[in-house]
Curated annotation (Swiss-Prot):
The lineage of its organism: Bacteria, Bacillati, Cyanobacteriota, Cyanophyceae, Synechococcales. FAD binds at residues 13-41. PANTHER family: GLYCEROL-3-PHOSPHATE DEHYDROGENASE (PTHR11985), GLYCEROL-3-PHOSPHATE DEHYDROGENASE, MITOCHONDRIAL (PTHR11985:SF15). This is Glycerol-3-phosphate dehydrogenase. GO terms for molecular function: glycerol-3-phosphate dehydrogenase (quinone) activity. GO terms for cellular component: cytoplasm. It comes from Synechocystis sp. (strain ATCC 27184 / PCC 6803 / Kazusa).
Length: 553
């Protein structure tokens, strides 16, 4: 799998840097259309922006205000594609917008937006919107603030509770199609030749320290590193001397933070899309994995991209706004069980309000900068990753001066949605006496048809059917499967991205680590030294990214 000498000696057509959703989507599209493809990711797949979103597959209702109708239409079409190609991961989500007399958008404006949203999603399978009177809204959300209520609007979008697993399934699909997909490989340098090409990419394995070089003279190099786009462009050199690829900054990231809380008094049964009182920015209160996901914020960000964290002020803002619309909640800092924050890789614009910066993606061809085989993605959303991949690969074929085969991803299901001989009902009959039914259902939610592969592990080693910790349905076989079949190399990979253990245990997953390490020692060959080192790194990761600062003082 990590055969660096072979990779070093392979001539690739397409080399993708960055393993977020747009990178793996591009690699998948390229591999499925016959390109010899390599993807390099310095951390884990979906370890950046793709992992820190609000977990919505949505059209972007808010973008209508900025007349980005093409973006909304494209997003709504891609929402429909994902509902069909990844139905185990992407589910319909009902959202309700309360309208108050202090709202910046009047009831009729919301209604007009809803009508337009329905028109732009003319080919949808989800229900159309409905407007609610104040009385109807209060019947549905009895604990919501009543003062000044003008009514509401109810509509449907999509939710991907396990966004990291969407990225992973696209990765596995790309790998199955022949792409070499490498996590924990950092790009250390881009060699710019005299012929205006990136001729070599110097890499280092982050796990072993091994260095190797990929020949890129015949390839098109795609930079899908999100907020790191400018940083990667800054790695170019010629004959050991730095060479500037771009003269101007391309990415102007904005930071979005979320908090996770337990169900609270008056918690809504379905999602709310609320306008914040303080700054008029819309945010979400969403039921998520038995808890509530609340966010997001939107602030310009120029800090470290590798350590992004919700500030105490952002946490206080989300708590206060939730308490304002749900007065019975009375949330405090002590109710926050988990936080996460990410950076949106938006185009750099000077002086524009963060919320008004376009969410349209840009395929930036660096031939205008004197590099003919490098394209950077600026922007890009979780929802539209497939479209981005298709556009990128069309462009790659054009630059290679080859005719592009048809793109198959519009209808091709992701691995967990492919036909599999073992259905949920069959699994219940076959394993119901050996495994808790709740755990079997949970496996099918996470892995879809691939749940059968995990159940096969349990069949071979029954102890792997035991829960990792009593309060969660996750079983030990998932740990083994993550390492053996899903390229997990660290405890953070396992608890934060292959499962959601870190986010739903109320202690950042710390209580699960000892048991997970025992499973890794027994079944995956981990040493005690390796376990101890990983536990330490796990604690560091949580302190740097997820545990509020006020809890660390």
């Amino acid at each position: 799998m990590r055969n660096f000498p072979e990779i070093q000696n392979t001539a690739y057509d397409l080399i993708v840097i960055g393993g977020g959703i747009n990178g793996v989507g591009t690699a998948r599209d390229g591999a499925l259309r016959g390109l010899k493809t390599l993807l390099i990711e310095k951390d884990d797949f979906a370890s950046g922006t793709s992992s820190w979103s609000t977990r919505l597959i949505h059209g972007g209702l808010r973008y209508l205000e900025y007349f980005e109708f093409n973006l909304v239409r494209e997003s709504l079409r891609e929402r429909e594609v994902l509902l069909h190609t990844a139905p185990h991961l992407v589910q319909p989500l009902q959202l309700t917008i309360p309208v108050y007399d202090w709202s910046s958008r009047a009831y009729w404006e919301i209604q007009a937006g809803m009508i337009l949203y329905d028109i732009l999603s003319f080919d949808k399978t989800l229900p159309s919107h409905r407007m609610l009177s104040p009385q109807q809204f209060q019947q549905l959300f009895r604990a919501a603030e009543k003062k000044g209520l003008k009514g509401g609007a109810q509509y449907f979008d999509g939710q991907v509770e396990y966004a990291e697993r969407l990225d992973l399934e696209v990765t596995l699909s790309a790998q199955k199609a022949g792409a070499a997909m490498l996590n924990y490989v950092a790009v250390k340098g881009l060699e710019k030749g005299e012929n205006n090409l990136i001729t070599a990419i110097h890499c280092q394995d982050q796990l072993s320290g091994e260095k190797f070089t990929v020949n890129s003279a015949q390839a098109i190099v795609i930079n899908t590193t999100g907020p790191w786009v400018d940083e990667v462009c800054g790695l170019a050199h010629r004959g050991g001397e730095p060479v500037a690829i771009v003269q101007e900054r391309k990415i102007g990231g904005t930071k979005g933070s979320h908090i996770v809380v337990d169900p609270f008094p008056g918690a809504p049964a379905s999602a709310l899309y609320v306008e914040a009182f303080v700054d008029k920015r819309p945010y979400f209160i969403i039921p998520w994995l038995g808890k509530y996901l609340i966010g997001t914020t939107d602030h310009r960000y120029d800090g470290s991209l590798d350590r992004v964290k919700a500030s105490d002020d952002e946490i206080d803002y989300l708590i206060a706004e939730t308490n304002r619309v749900m007065p019975a909640a009375q949330l405090t800092r002590q109710d926050v069980r988990f936080t996460y924050s990410g950076v949106r890789p938006l185009p750099y614009t000077d002086g524009k309000k963060a919320g008004s910066i376009t969410r349209n993606h840009i395929l930036y061809d660096h031939s205008q900068d004197g590099v003919n085989n490098l394209i950077s993605l600026i922007g890009g959303k979780l929802t539209t990753y497939r479209q981005v991949g298709e556009e990128m690969v069309d462009k790659v074929y054009g630059k290679l001066r080859r005719s592009a085969p048809p793109c198959p991803t519009l209808t091709q299901p992701l691995p967990g949605a492919e036909a599999y001989p073992l259905s949920l009902e069959t699994a219940m009959d076959k394993y119901g006496n050996h495994l808790e039914r709740h755990s079997i259902q949970h496996l099918f939610c996470l892995y879809g048809a691939r749940a059968g592969d995990i159940l096969a592990l349990v069949h071979g080693a029954p102890e792997l059917g035991e829960r990792i910790i009593p309060s969660l349905p996750d079983i030990k076989a998932q740990v083994v499967f993550a390492v053996q079949a899903e390229m997990a190399h660290t405890l953070v990979d396992i608890c934060r991205r292959r499962t959601a253990i870190a986010m739903v245990t109320n202690d950042y997953g710390f209580s699960a680590l000892a048991g997970i390490c025992q499973t890794l020692t027994d079944h995956c060959g981990w040493t005690q030294e390796q376990c101890d080192k990983q536990i330490q790194k796990y604690h560091e990761y949580m302190e740097q990214n997820c545990i509020p600062d006020y809890c660390l003082h």
